[in-house]
Amino acid sequence: MTSKIENITIEQLPIIDIESYGNDKEEELKKKLISKEIENACKNFGFFYIKGHGIDQELIDRLERLSKKFFSLDQSIKMKYRMELAQKAWRGYFVVGGELTSGLKDWKEGLYLGTELNDDHPLVIAQTPLHGLNLFPTLEEEIEYDIVGFKDTILTYIDKVTKLGHSLMELIAISLNLSADYFSSRYTKDPLILYRIFNYPSIISSGDDNKTTGESSDDNDKVEWGVGEHTDYGVLTILYQDDVGGLQVHSKNGWISAPPIKGTFVCNIGDMLDRMTGGLYRSTPHRVELNRSGRDRISFPLFFDPNFNSYPTEIEGIEQIENKDDSSSRWDHFNIHSFKGSYGQYLLNKIGKVFPDLKNNVL
């Protein structure tokens, strides 16, 4: 197993305090100040940390603890919740190396989750991909596997961070001199929420023997990253990462580290916000190093995306840049500003490359 070594620039992503004040005047002033910080961060980095977000640390710690217990279960147990079983809902467990970036295996395992929609929901009845029920252990299984509260904790976390996403999109709208409800009135009143719990097993290298702390692989030589270089697809990603670290962001000056900072989330904009802003706010490439810490790394990205059936278009009347087409320098060489279609069409094309076999079988 090999890992590419590149110089890392010493540079710090902005940390933005989004905590609001009590009365209306103070809150409006704070929103304007925060939005200015977000504008600068989105123009210069496409990434920023937030603190003062209001998500209870006890909830985060509980979910991290339960997630680690889940991933420590025997592989045969985890496979009871494999993604193939969820069919079009595209939910469930995938094995280490089961997810691809640019055709190469990522060194992580994970759970795909999202907003819980019952079988009688109109989008589920219409067999809309990526909508439906999550694959959770039953209460009896939670007791048996010592992960009691796993389902409830996940759904609580999704609900609270989704609400945070709505608040952040208001601030992003204000940062563009738009009405606070610009995105919610057009694209995100009923957002597509894609939530992931990722576990990056630690790698132990000794001579020619390549092993992880938990498993071995027959195809290690093709693995170079925990997650390879990519951009996110939607409008906003809200990421919690544990204290292991490994996230890297491609700034204007080169690759920089985005280390864990207690009490914060890492936020970044995605392809659709890049498209809507005409490239003013760029979706920034990022990646995760192979984990050599000696212990597993956990992260929780929540992708706050436009409604599946919405048609994102460029915002009129905002600041323009000269060269919005950056396809020549993008990791995938795709011009997102030339795309015409629904967000669902864009997303299905992208995720089909992440799980090509699954796409062929269920979509």
From Swiss-Prot:
Entry-linked Gene3D superfamilies: B-lactam Antibiotic, Isopenicillin N Synthase, Chain
Single GO molecular function: 2-oxoglutarate-dependent dioxygenase activity
Note describing how the cofactor binds: Binds 1 Fe(2+) ion per subunit.
Taxonomy, superkingdom: Eukaryota
EC number: 1.14.-.-
Transmembrane segments: none
PANTHER family hit by this protein: 2-OXOGLUTARATE (2OG) AND FE(II)-DEPENDENT OXYGENASE SUPERFAMILY PROTEIN-RELATED
Similarity section: Belongs to the iron/ascorbate-dependent oxidoreductase family.
Protein name in UniProt: Probable iron/ascorbate oxidoreductase DDB_G0283291
Protein species of origin: Dictyostelium discoideum (Social amoeba)
Lineage, broadest ranks: Eukaryota, Amoebozoa, Evosea, Eumycetozoa, Dictyostelia
